[in-house]
A protein has these predicted regions:
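Positively charged, aromatic-enriched patches within helix-turn-helix-type DNA-binding elements
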Residues: 26, 31-36, 42-79, 88-90
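A structural micro-motif at secondary-structure boundaries
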Residues: 14-41, 105-115
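Flexible loop/N-cap segments at domain edges
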Residues: 73-115
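Short aromatic/basic micro-patch
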Residues: 12-14, 19, 35, 54, ...
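Glycine-centered flexibility sites
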Residues: 16, 52, 66, 101-103
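Glycine-rich, flexible loop/turn motifs
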Residues: 9, 32, 95
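Basic, amphipathic DNA-recognition helix from helix-turn-helix-like DNA-binding domains
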Residues: 1-15, 114-115
Length: 115
């Protein structure tokens, strides 16, 4: 089941049980919070604003890194890996899912799928 991001006040986005505080660049969850580096924040904000929508790597690179994007998709994979680790540490019920040759999306994960 996928839910679009819900805006909470002017500085919060919410998907599943995770909130993104856009003022402090922090992921907030019932278990705690994780501060995000600049690129991590930009990528997570893009995912949360487009929850459930597959986005090709090229779009992620253009929107987060802009015209100065490094060649190759490895940099996107690395930052997605950082975000996945932080989401896991928080016990989030959302995951960044990969679809071969189609891109990545942020999805709400049912409890049975998390185990």
């Amino acid at each position: 089941m996928t839910r679009a991001a819900t805006a909470i006040g002017a500085t919060m986005l919410s998907v599943g049980n995770v909130r993104l505080d856009t003022a402090s660049c922090t992921l907030v969850d019932p278990l705690g919070e994780e501060h995000l580096a600049n690129r991590e924040f930009q990528l997570m904000e893009l995912f949360m604003r487009n929850a459930g929508t597959r986005m090709p790597t090229e779009r992620l690179m253009l929107e987060v890194w802009g015209e100065d994007a490094p060649e190759g998709a490895n940099v996107v994979w690395v930052y997605i890996s950082y975000l996945r680790k932080k989401l896991t540490a928080l016990g989030a019920n959302v995951a960044i899912c990969a679809s071969r040759n189609q891109g990545y999306s942020l999805e709400v994960v049912e409890e049975s799928e998390q185990a």
